[in-house]
Amino acid sequence: GYVREGEGLVQALSATAASGPFREIGAVRCRKTKGNRIVPLGAMFFLEIAAGVPMTKSVEVINASEAMDARRKDLLSDRGLKDKTVALLGAGSLGSKVGLLLSEAGVGRFLVVDRDHLDVANLSRHACDVADVGRSKAMAVAELVQRRLVASEAIDVDIVALDDPTLDAMLASVDLAVSTTDSPACQFTVNEACLRTGTAGLFAGAYERACGGEVVLVQPGNSPCLFCAVGFRADISEVAPEERRKAYQSADAQQLMAEPGLGADLAYLSAIATAYALAVLDPTGMRAALASPE
């Protein structure tokens, strides 16, 4: 079972079997929600129903975090990612997939920032589903990653509209800023904030029709910034200039617009972005070489 409401201990749980509704009285820890902040309290419960009859003696409370860690054993460093915080700047198709993958890897906390709301057209590629249509993308993705038993906070705001001190304070509190917005102004705003705060930044975006994409890792003091990297890419890319134009971006790079593309192509790009994110977050792990300036 998954308890969505209440705080602290849940005293009454209800379910429906073939024989009709029943109620199991017990104490099961659940998550608690405070405004836009979602905090998991560390346990899930399972109630076995055999032949339509509730078997109350089969209620089991497990340490879900430890159970999930068993599938990540030896793939990450001993400390894992529980004490890491990631800012997801952009909760669209690409950002939602990267966030989900990082939560499955064990990242302990997310700060999700996006001003848009999920619509039906997004469902062909977004990690969220029809139940989230009409909701804030930030809140929907915050709850999506929370279902992997991590803490999350949603902020419904235009990143470009934030003043420098507010954005700097936000990024200074995280270990990695993952920017997947398709607004050049937003990307460069985040890039500048990363340089001011010394926070590592990962910038990912798809090209037109998701024919390809780019992942740029910025490590202040150890790598070029986004502005420098974008300036060099024309010299090293084998993709034609017209195909390399970022998705959702008009020729003047100001107006955002809908762009065709398959979720499968974005999944490939999000997997690459996630690998680089893990290299930064787990510097002694098996992917650490990806983040090496050498």
Q: Where is each model-derived feature located?
A:
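Phosphate/oxyanion-binding active-site loops and adjacent basic polyanion-contact surfaces
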Residues: 91, 130-138, 219, 266, ...
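Glycine- and acidic
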Residues: 83-84, 92, 123-127, 255-262
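Glycine-rich adenosine-cofactor-binding loop
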Residues: 74-117
